[in-house]
Amino acid sequence: MTTLNLSTLSERIKAHKTALVHIVKPPVCTERALHYTEMYQQHMDKPIPVRRALALAHHLTQRTIWIKHDELIIGNQASEVRAAPIFPEYTVSWIEKEIDDLADRPGAGFAVSEENKRVLHEICPWWRGQTVQDRCYGMFTDEQKGLLETGIIKAEGNMTSGDAHLAVNFPLLLEKGLDGLRDKVAERRSRINLTVLDDLHGEQFLKAIDIVLEAVSLHIERFAALAREMAATESRESRRDELLAMAENCDVIAHQPPTTFWQALQLCYFIQLILQIESNGHSVSFARMDQYLYPYYRRDVELNQSLDREHAIELLHSCWLKLLEVNKIRSGSHSKASAGSPLYQNVTIGGQTLINGEPMDAVNPLSYAILESCGRLRSTQPNLSVRYHAGMSNDFLDACVQVIRCGFGMPAFNNDEIVIPEFIKLGVEKEDAYDYAAIGCIETAVGGKWGYRCTGMSFINFARVMLAALEGGRDATSGKVFLPQEKALSAGNFDNFEEVMAAWDTQIRYYTRKSIEIEYVVDTMLEENVPDILCSALVDDCIERAKSIKQGGAKYDWVSGLQVGIANLGNSLAAVKKLVFEQGTIGQQQLAAALADDFDGLTHEQLRQRLINGAPKYGNDDDSVDMLLTRAYETYIAELKQYHNPRYGRGPIGGNYYAGTSSISANVPFGAATMATPDGRKAHTPLAEGASPASGTDHLGPTAVIGSVGKLPTEAILGGVLLNQKLNPSTLENDSDRQKLMVLLRTFFEVHKGWHIQYNIVSRETLLEAKKHPDQYRDLVVRVAGYSAFFTALSPDAQDDIIARTEHTL
């Protein structure tokens, strides 16, 4: 077995990481907001794609750039390290309300200078009524506004930020270079017919792409000039040589395809960076980096030996730390659902590739190097994912387990054995299906060929829908009734449990439809107001169709619906079925009263203990609850499948919705807005995250957990089935322990057809100490949901949720 070196960092990488993790309250940068406001005001007569292209070009020309001491990969998102830009075209309402108090946010604070406060208060009024969020609310019906106000459905994230959740076509970028892409645009423009309406609009889009690609080249040239300027005054010969090498790298990649590993990595980073300057959507991912960068790595490291492996890993480390510099500021309410300010920049390694039509293991030496580099650095970025398949070698799987043992929540695994065949059934071409990658958290798509948001825009609170189903359609939190029904626990008039399930079916169908209606509004406003030009230029077939991604330019386009509280739904239904209808030990009105009182008082607390201990719980491989949950979930899935997204029939293959369970950290704020539930959960406490069991209810170990998760209709949940597991570090102390985990992984993926799994390897005691003494644990990384975050950067509620998760042993 290969033993990875998981302890070595160069001195420069140590210094850069230490500096970054000790930025507790990052600054806010207003340069982008100012530049975009200037260009929007100057070019109100221009079509929106051209206006946005000119704004991005102006910003790339005028913004502050810098090269940090001794860094090897260059490019900055904002004027200061880890500063978060402001994107006023999406929203200004929360900015105006919260900007003066951003430093006081628990776990998500930002430092805002008085000058930046002044700038924002000066420019925000111009944007009022013109932002994406404003225009969404101008289109919502009163019913939709009411639903959003209650929080049963939440869709704030995409009204206040960009789409993203995709990977662009990095292989095409590396093959053609920026000038080659401009040639492709020019060729397509030569075939435009300005007497055809679609071509008239298409010409403006293609013109915008050309403006942006030229601006990207000029921007890279600015860094070449800066590196040379710094080299001229650098006293250390070794650093002077590095600066001149970086300048030469930039000279090449500003126009031409890269010729070395360093150049290829630098070009990919520049594009990754500018995508997140163009739009503030998160989960901009790299797709299968070990595949498209391997030819450069092989040439430099293995064949020419012009680059040694250790220096290649240092280049990767430098890139990973640049990803950590990228930052995003969210509204206070939205930040609670994305605890730790994650960017979800995923890198996928492993899996399979087709050789002469036959699948072959795709693991190569760069796969090991990327895995090892992440294991050494132990950062939150990139979000590292491994594609598992039955033919994966024990050597590589063992290497993955070695990195898991490092305790920073990576790598996560996705399963080729279910993703590939299900993608092919959807209509994805075989070659593309074998080239899928993890995007953001756990969702999957084909890099450079899939539209935005392979995970959804709106979250449904399953627990609140379930409570409404039990009480005649009344939302327990707000008291509002959106879809009235006759049957209610408080009336004691359910005749049998089948009527409870019928009530659930009715309510979830209603809320599912409403969530799609809301998504349609948000989708439409994003399409009309903020087309992403650079991003679309790097996704097939946007240039050929002369359409942005949002207009239907991508080859594929599926979107998943999202929900929170899956385990709470199953556990609650199981408790009602067993204790109320089968055993009759709890009366309908008795349960309703206990829920309304949040189990207050001795009698209600005793009833709560019966709900907790006397009914089966998801996560223990018990069909009586697992299959009931599946039955309830399938109603949601069937309803979701009926709908098409706004790109349907406009070009892409697909255009439908499917389910997904990537709840990020929304289980905490959603739980805070949810009253007591029949599984014994108290009001305002976190819901279960993803498809994981509710905290403290999975008593029979990890094997039972994967048994339960494997019963979910995974083949229909193509947005991903998120499973978090927490293991005590003592569980993986020796080779025999690692073998146990490898067997468990193979069983989960091959026998139970699991979609995804990830591990927290950290003790409860360590987490409690880190919460008590945060300054001593600034570099402690934990898995939150489908992403990792620095534990001390989380809010206290999010920290408590992770501490409360069941700690298993093998």
Residue ranges and their predicted role:
Residues 218, 222-225, 229:
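Extended, non-transmembrane alpha-helical coiled-coils
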Residues 207-218:
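Extended non-globular scaffold/tether segments
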Residues 2-206, 238-245, 249-810:
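Conserved catalytic cores of very large enzyme subunits
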Residues 231-238:
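A conserved hydrophobic secondary-structure block that centers on an alpha-helix together
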